[in-house]
Curated annotation (Swiss-Prot):
Up-regulation conditions: By sarcosine.
One function term, GO molecular function aspect: sarcosine oxidase activity
Subcellular location: Cytoplasm
Catalyzed chemical reaction(s): sarcosine + O2 + H2O = formaldehyde + glycine + H2O2
Annotated family: Belongs to the MSOX/MTOX family. MSOX subfamily.
Protein name, as recorded: Monomeric sarcosine oxidase
Positions carrying S-8alpha-FAD cysteine: C316
Assembly with partners or alone: Monomer.
InterPro entries associated with the record: FAD-dep_OxRdtase, FAD/NAD-bd_sf, MTOX, SoxA_mon
Keywords: Cytoplasm, FAD, Flavoprotein, Oxidoreductase
Cofactor note: Binds 1 FAD per subunit.
Pfam families for this protein: DAO
EC class: oxidoreductase
Organism: Bacillus sp. (strain NS-129)
Amino acid sequence: MSTHFDVIVVGAGSMGMAAGYYLAKQGVKTLLVDSFDPPHTNGSHHGDTRIIRHAYGEGREYVPFALRAQELWYELEKETHHKIFTQTGVLVYGPKGGSAFVSETMEAANIHSLEHELFEGKQLTDRWAGVEVPDNYEAIFEPNSGVLFSENCIQAYRELAEAHGATVLTYTPVEDFEVTEDLVTIKTAKGSYTANKLVVSMGAWNSKLLSKLDVEIPLQPYRQVVGFFECDEAKYSNNAHYPAFMVEVENGIYYGFPSFGGSGLKIGYHSYGQQIDPDTINREFGAYPEDEANLRKFLEQYMPGANGELKKGAVCMYTKTPDEHFVIDLHPKYSNVAIAAGFSGHGFKFSSVVGETLAQLATTGKTEHDISIFSLNRDALKKEAVK
């Protein structure tokens, strides 16, 4: 195996694997290095499914990025035998006038002329029999959004990257970096590898390893859980046209997915999580009583027909920045190093376009996408890390 490459990608999860594909597709000699064997269950993006929304409650600035991501997912599905996307639509709702997230989602849809429908109170329960909400709730339904099959996405990118000549080095943690303006060296237990350019997308491990590149970003990894629950398939399944959803209630934001082929309704509590070290995280669902209790609390009140037996649970990670916006930028000192970090629990849907962006940054030092909101130099990153 060669030890010198045009570009080395450290961290071959969703973002890194996508970057590897877009690099290799251009004929760039690419090495992807990962501590595990992606797709795997040790990072941030397993658990079968992820939502892709276009009208974006985290900020209308994300909409063009989301739309490009969707285009790339469609392209990926045409190039692979894996199922990538299902257009379930996405329903976002919460108390009228009491949810900044719902309000921003509606504003984003209006500003960017995205197809959508609005509902209030009983209109919502009339449309979807499985939803129970107070009369003062409002909702926006975005029919063109839906669900991505996360492991399939990563697997497809890996297969295509390798088909285009990329090398994937698994079970190889990076121990150290040496960087100059025209050469990058990564050091591992299997040896050292060099490249002209480096892409760093290490997920939760960014919080531990970026300092070796003389980059300090206030990143905090969190333990996050999802559960799959027995449900009334006639109400809550994809076959019954039940949508993916995000709901803001008194104690935070919940998100979930319809049952696919009897999988059960999947639900997560976005506002939950323990601060962790990615090397010592407890990966057992139910290790904390709140793992299941928080999910049941929501189901009992808002989706009682899905409050059945727990079929399975999964543990993954969020890595948050103080403002919960991403970091996608070039190294402040070395323009041959591109960094992707801090996706704060809402990044997977963008991994296609993040991969494209990283490939552009690595090969040309710039990107066609507006990534100013993701700058390393923004004020929020100069403050203390998330507590």
